[in-house]
Amino acid sequence: FGSMARFVPALPLIGGGQTRFQPIFAGDVAECVLKAVDAPTKYAGRTFELGGPSTYSFKELMEFILTTIRRKRLLVPVPFFAAYPLGMVGEILGALPFVQPFLTRDQVTLLKSDNVVGETDEDLGATADFGIDLETVEAITPTYLARYRKGGQFSEDPELIS
């Protein structure tokens, strides 16, 4: 959506932006995998749902992206029934060479369900079982969203200069 925000005056909030997410940093997932490989008897035969330390609504994530890339865009609530035709148009355009679909029907379907860690039990584990300190969206995301700001990653930002 950071890329899309560079070119369009408004961004869609599919389903009103209420879908919940629990994003996790890929480096944290890798750390969990390494711990599982290093201690197979502790983790073998179990399934783990991995999620980050916080949950966000789709709307909250969109607002965070826009704030991070310093762009003001209108966020337009789009009900699911209206998003499906948009997804079909996106798929048709995506069939053209060198065109990335802006939205697909599969993405709309995925946005109908929250993407968060559920309840755990002895067979179903969670990120906490690995005992690692998780990175936050606020700590990681600005470093790779910087390229979508006006001036790109080379515009001055005291928060990103270390």
Question: Where do the model's predicted regions map?
Answer:
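Core catalytic loop region at the nicotinamide-binding pocket of NAD(P)H-dependent oxidoreductases
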Residues: 36-51, 71-76, 99-103, 122, ...
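Residues at helix-coil transition
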Residues: 6, 38, 70, 142-146
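A short C-terminal helix-loop "cap" of Rossmann-like NAD(P)-dependent dehydrogenase/epimerase domains
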Residues: 2-15
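Substrate-binding strand-loop-helix patch
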Residues: 20-27, 48-68, 77-88, 133-135
